[in-house]
């Protein structure tokens, strides 16, 4: 057990001590073991990532305005354009976002802003995902609960409704999190999956970072660097590909980290490293590695996983492509091609909105998924100089099918910040933007496609 680098002494408080004959590798502190594997496996080497020197072979330089374009696109994706729209789906998303905010504010009422004399938060202990639900009959409060249900609604309430009390509560929660171990270099026992259930923290940070003091901003940036594993971007991997979990949950948070660095040169280094990382992550992965395969199917857990993981990773990759397009940090033409062909292939092997039953992994009831990729079609199509005709035509056939209307409506109505936060107003605005183009929908897809890496 080590004190923080800037501290020579202190007091350790133990909230819960458990003696157990067996500890799952998923529940042990990632800082305690040495990772011998060099591939992109599920065993993340947090300490190696943290200690990697922030450098790249060739820095891609950019003007402040060019970087601002990326940040502005991301902000608009979160908050919407602010323009009045009569579109029913935009209105539906806005209405359900309001419900999401109100629900979060109600849950946040139980959190009282209180500090001790030493300026530490006066609050109950917080526990990671791997901790028991109760101890001696007492319900435990976990980081994940606040991450998923409270942080993002508060941040949206401040940005959209200018509620200063919501801002104050988020800043208090950041202090509370930090006091309980949510910090740079902290293991908390479950980093393996804690990082995947932290979307509320990541996205609230971007929305509120301009309101943070310089000291608080620096503290949270270091925390963000740790939990997003941004250090992977500075490393040179042995092969193309990336774990779908790390794409769907951490691709946008990695970009948030890079955009939030104040020093101009360091920001350019980080954005260059991120662009290189994403180009490699969305490359064609060999063998059983994730995620994109040579036949433009997708792997996770060393096999096809079309009900989850893979489509989520496609979504994240497509969104990154849109945010970076037409800037010095735009993803490569090869990466755009991979995303385009992967989306077209996904729609080809779907029956209606359903993926083949033999490719659903451990989610037998998760066949219906194609409607959740409609925004990804829009992101990639709009990343070209002109909307891509093939993607747009495929998108419109799915969108305009009467049999798909209810599923699409359900998707638009659902707003949450679970594993990955995607249910934004900006998402639906881009979807409707592509829908309004003059490109006609494609005919019903037919023919034969040989997918050598999917065995049904």
List the model feature ranges, each with a label.
Residues 76-377:
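Aromatic-lined, polymer-binding surfaces characteristic
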Residues 30-95:
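Extreme N-terminal leader/anchor segments
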Residues 320-454:
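Extended polysaccharide-engagement surfaces of secreted carbohydrate-active enzymes
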Residues 62-66, 163, 263, 388:
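Short, solvent-exposed helix-helix connector turns and helix-capping sites enriched
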Residues 1-19:
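Extracellular beta-strand ligand-recognition surfaces/modules
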Residues 67, 71, 267, 391-392, ...:
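Short amphipathic alpha-helical segments that mediate assembly, nucleic-acid/protein binding
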Residues 21-30:
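Short, charged low-complexity linker/loop segments at the C-terminal edge of domains
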């Amino acid at each position: 057990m080590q004190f923080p680098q800037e501290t020579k002494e202190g007091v350790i408080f133990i909230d819960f001590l458990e003696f157990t004959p067996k500890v799952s590798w998923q529940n042990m502190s990632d800082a305690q073991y040495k990772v011998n594997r060099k591939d992109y496996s599920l065993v993340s080497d947090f300490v190696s990532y943290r200690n990697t020197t922030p450098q790249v072979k060739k820095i891609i330089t950019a003007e402040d305005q060019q970087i601002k374009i990326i940040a502005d696109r991301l902000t608009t994706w979160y908050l919407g354009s602010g323009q009045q729209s009569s579109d029913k789906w935009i209105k539906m998303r806005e209405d359900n976002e309001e419900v999401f905010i109100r629900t979060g504010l109600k849950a946040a009422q139980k959190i009282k802003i209180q500090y001790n004399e030493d300026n530490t938060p006066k609050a109950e202990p917080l526990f990671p995902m791997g901790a028991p639900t109760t101890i001696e009959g007492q319900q435990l409060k976990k980081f994940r609960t606040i991450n998923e249900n409270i942080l993002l609604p508060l941040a949206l309430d401040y940005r959209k409704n200018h509620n200063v009390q919501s801002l104050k509560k988020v800043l208090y929660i950041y202090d509370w999190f930090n006091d309980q171990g949510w910090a740079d270099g902290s293991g908390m026992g479950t980093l393996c999956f804690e990082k995947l259930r932290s979307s509320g923290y990541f996205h609230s940070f971007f929305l509120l970072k301009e309101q943070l003091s310089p000291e608080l901003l620096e503290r949270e940036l270091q925390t963000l660097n740790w939990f997003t594993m941004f250090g992977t971007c500075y490393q040179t991997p042995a092969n193309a590909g990336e774990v779908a979990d790390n794409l769907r949950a951490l691709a946008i948070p990695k970009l948030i980290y890079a955009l939030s660095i104040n020093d101009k040169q360091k920001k350019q280094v980080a954005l260059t490293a991120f662009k290189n990382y994403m180009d490699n992550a969305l490359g064609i992965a060999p063998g059983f590695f994730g995620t994109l395969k040579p036949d433009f199917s997708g792997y996770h857990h060393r096999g096809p996983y079309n009900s989850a993981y893979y489509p989520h990773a496609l979504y994240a990759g497509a969104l990154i492509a849109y945010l970076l397009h037409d800037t010095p940090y735009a993803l490569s033409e090869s990466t755009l091609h991979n995303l385009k062909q992967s989306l077209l292939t996904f729609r080809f092997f779907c029956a209606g909105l359903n993926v083949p039953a033999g490719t659903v992994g451990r989610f037998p009831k998760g066949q219906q998924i194609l409607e959740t990729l409609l925004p990804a079609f829009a992101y990639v199509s709009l990343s070209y100089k002109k909307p891509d005709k093939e993607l747009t035509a495929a998108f419109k056939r799915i969108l305009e099918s009467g049999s798909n209307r209810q599923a699409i409506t359900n998707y638009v109505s659902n707003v949450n910040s679970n594993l990955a936060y995607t249910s934004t107003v900006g998402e639906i605005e881009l979807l409707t933007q592509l829908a309004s183009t003059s490109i006609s929908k494609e005919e019903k897809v037919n023919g034969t496609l040989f997918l050598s890496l999917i065995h049904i």
